[in-house]
Amino acid sequence: MFLFDWFYGILASLGLWQKEAKILFLGLDNAGKTTLLHMLKDERLVQHQPTQHPTSEELSIGKIKFKAFDLGGHQIARRVWKDYYAKVDAVVYLVDAYDKERFAESKRELDALLSDEALATVPFLILGNKIDIPYAASEDELRYHLGLTNFTTGKGKVTLGDSGVRPLEVFMCSIVRKMGYGEGFKWLSQYIN
């Protein structure tokens, strides 16, 4: 219940209690997308099979409504990602911070998303997951491998106004330890209209 109250408190304090948003959860397979979605929905950790088909969940926290789409991350599932870009309010892109051998593949997918015109103004929250595992990448290391060292907008309340700059930031987290992703969603919530 603590996580629910904490997450609600953050979003409510930012004036999101009457907003609705369509959020895509994207990233390679085994990055933690489904685990995060179920942690936000049910506050419980469950072993999941790889996502074979796109799923959506309605998340209600207080008066906040999110429609979250978990599209799977294996190569076949990535082919349908484009089908969900219409009217999306935000993208949460998860990266397995421990699986350094797949950073190049994750960068290619992220680059394709960031260069897609349909997502040109959509805020991106990049979560480096699994920091609870020894030798997982640091935030600086992940930024470097994803090519984001000088391309993020800043973690605080950053007013972008009409600058045309896409909100984009990296946060490190451990979904299984329930740490880090709350700060990421707090940052993201300021850009959801």
Swiss-Prot record:
Activity regulation summary: Small GTPases activation is mediated by guanine exchange factors (GEF), while inactivation through hydrolysis of the bound GTP is stimulated by GTPase activating proteins (GAP).
Record-listed GDP binding positions: 30-35, 53, 129-130, 132, 175
Binding site for GTP: 30, 32-35, 129-130, 132, 175
One of the Pfam families matching this protein, by short name: Arf
Subcellular location: Endoplasmic reticulum membrane; Golgi apparatus, Golgi stack membrane
Residues that bind Mg(2+): 29, 70
An example Gene Ontology biological process: intracellular protein transport
Motif (STAR): 2-4
Keyword Nucleotide-binding: yes
Membrane topology of this protein: Peripheral membrane protein
Keywords: Endoplasmic reticulum, ER-Golgi transport, Golgi apparatus, GTP-binding, Hydrolase, Magnesium, Membrane, Metal-binding, Nucleotide-binding, Protein transport, Transport
GO terms under cellular component: cytosol; endoplasmic reticulum; endoplasmic reticulum membrane; extrinsic component of membrane; Golgi cisterna membrane; plasma membrane
Enzyme Commission identifier(s): 3.6.5.2
MF annotations from Gene Ontology: GTP binding; GTPase activity; metal ion binding
Residue ranges, annotated region (Mediates recruitment to ER membranes): 10-14
Oligomer and partners: Homodimer; upon association with membrane. Part of the coat protein complex II/COPII, composed of SEC23/24 and SEC13/31 heterodimers, that it helps recruit and assemble on endoplasmic reticulum (ER) membranes at ER exit site. Interacts with BZIP28.
Free-text function comment from the UniProt entry: Small GTPase that cycles between an active GTP-bound and an inactive GDP-bound state and mainly functions in vesicle-mediated endoplasmic reticulum (ER) to Golgi transport. The active GTP-bound form inserts into the endoplasmic reticulum membrane where it recruits the remainder of the coat protein complex II/COPII. The coat protein complex II assembling and polymerizing on endoplasmic reticulum membrane is responsible for both the sorting of cargos and the deformation and budding of membranes into vesicles destined to the Golgi.
Official protein name in the record: Small COPII coat GTPase SAR1B
Source organism: Arabidopsis thaliana (Mouse-ear cress)
